[in-house]
Amino acid sequence: MATPDGEQVWAQLQPQDRAWLNDLSRRAGPDTELALVGGAVRDALLGQTPLDLDIVVAGQDGQGVEALALASGLPFVFHPAFENATLTLPDGRGADLVRARREHYPQPGRNPEPLPGTLHDDLRRRDFGLNALALRLREDGAPELLDVVGGLRDLERRELRPLHDRSLHEDASRLVRAARLAARLELHPAPELLAQVPDALALADDTPRLWAELKLLLAEPRPGQAARVLDGWGAGTLLPGLPLLEALDVQQNAGTPVQPGTYAAAVLSAAPDAAALAERMALGERPAALLARALSDSYFAPGTPELQLRGLLRPESYLPLTGREVVALGVAPGPAVGRALAHLAGLRQSGAVRSADEERTALRAYLGANPKAT
């Protein structure tokens, strides 16, 4: 492909984003270097419209970053630990102002210690080459595309390449992030990435961010596809329930929406210790509650998450008779309906009925033995 330039990236941004980035550049001053970095540049080069914007601020300390956020006129929250600021754009999206830094990992899996750095330092600390591209913003003149680590070559090859041989050792969550990107953008792993997978797996328990990344994986457009990528890389043990996740993907592909919570419940159904996994991934209580309802004999309407899961976990299950149906079969409206449904529920729980037809037969026998129910 032709070598891309900054104008190509700039053109992919939304007009309102170009406007406020221009305004930010004017307010930054001559001693400050600003650059749009990471996923926004990558996605723009892939022909997509970037929505998540990260801007590196070089030449300023934390006070300078906070002052620039204030000068933007947008609501913001300042994060002192990394001297970053999160702006709230008019449409509700967030945009991060990130002080240029280097990073030191005192211990694998733990948060890195930030150190002052240049724009080039900031790009070299990133996870993969195609995420280390930058668009240098200028108050006057065309934006400049920067590639200091060979990210353009990786993007052309659609290859995920870690930037050094201890990348996944320092932060094993990069393994899951790579799988998410590979599934979403149809990327493949560089040999250097696959070589580091065993190291990442060995450090998974010591890397809280890895479990947070797995939760984010369940919110991907096709979580089953991302889980299949992990499995293909030899990391399938991180996320149980692959066949269920892929089956839910099939439902999505057929036009039936599937919520992240349904995927999470499917994972818990296959976990040796569901409670421990839910806590580690910070899933909250809802997926476990959804799973319990799906495994119950309660009635749920077609298309509900409970029924989506039940069809996978209990393929022999069926839709029990409803109150309207038992009335149509001869039960008198009123309290008799509840008693008839309770009788059928007891038969289901005992295994005495295993289909809607068997419920109808059992209901007729019930009515014969209880004529007052008619």
From Swiss-Prot:
UniProt GO molecular function: CC tRNA cytidylyltransferase activity; metal ion binding; nucleotide binding; tRNA binding
Keyword tRNA-binding in record: yes
Transmembrane segments: none
CDD domains referenced in this protein's UniProt entry, alphabetically: NT_ClassII-CCAase
Binding site for CTP: 39-42, 126-127, 131, 171-180, 209
Keyword list, A-Z: Magnesium, Metal-binding, Nucleotide-binding, Nucleotidyltransferase, RNA-binding, Transferase, tRNA processing, tRNA-binding
Sequence positions that bind Mg(2+): D52, D54
Enzyme class per UniProt: transferase
Catalysed transformations (reactions): a tRNA precursor + 2 CTP = a tRNA with a 3' CC end + 2 diphosphate
Pfam families: PolyA_pol
EC numbers: 2.7.7.-
InterPro entries according to UniProt: NT_sf, PolA_pol_head_dom, tRNA_nt/polyA_polymerase
Cofactor: Mg(2+)
Entries under SUPFAM superfamilies matching the protein: Nucleotidyltransferase (SSF81301), Poly A polymerase C-terminal region-like (SSF81891)
GO biological process: tRNA processing
Keyword Glycosyltransferase carried by entry: no
Family statement drawn from the similarity comment of this UniProt entry: Belongs to the tRNA nucleotidyltransferase/poly(A) polymerase family.
Free-text function comment from the UniProt entry: tRNA nucleotidyltransferase involved in the synthesis of the tRNA CCA terminus. Adds the two cytidine residues to tRNA.
Protein name per Swiss-Prot or TrEMBL: CC-adding tRNA nucleotidyltransferase
